[in-house]
From Swiss-Prot:
The gene is HHY1. Residues 91-102 are extracellular. This is Hypersensitivity to hygromycin-B protein 1. The chain crosses the membrane at residues 18-38, 70-90. Coiled coil: none annotated. The keyword Signal applies. It is found in: Membrane.
Length: 102
């Protein structure tokens, strides 16, 4: 059974397809942020170098920016996991309904 059947089954109301599309987009965007985690972890590990080459105010700003970016990456990872779980659940429901009509 193809993924397109699971996402766009004619046996289901249009809202299921809309939910699937939204979850797919959310998953893709979330994974983009989630894959930036290693980059920010490496950048956060080098804040001592920033302190050497910049003022104390710049150092505090960089630490704050680093913390925000890392938090956004972790949130992206959580959103990706949650949206993929929901997408799989919607696909499972569609599969059960689709097999009941065939």
């Amino acid at each position: 059974m193809s993924l397109s059947f699971l996402l766009f089954s004619p046996f289901l109301p249009p809202c299921f397809s809309s939910i699937s599309i939204c979850l797919s987009v959310l998953s893709t965007v979330s994974f983009f942020f989630a894959f930036t985690i290693p980059h920010y972890v490496l950048r956060c590990g080098s804040v001592d170098e920033w302190h050497i080459h910049s003022s104390a105010e710049d150092f505090r700003t960089q630490r704050c920016v680093c913390a925000v970016k890392l938090s956004a990456s972790l949130l992206g990872c959580l959103l990706a996991c949650a949206s993929w779980s929901l997408l799989l659940e919607v696909s499972r429901i569609k599969w059960h309904v689709g097999t009941a009509y065939s």
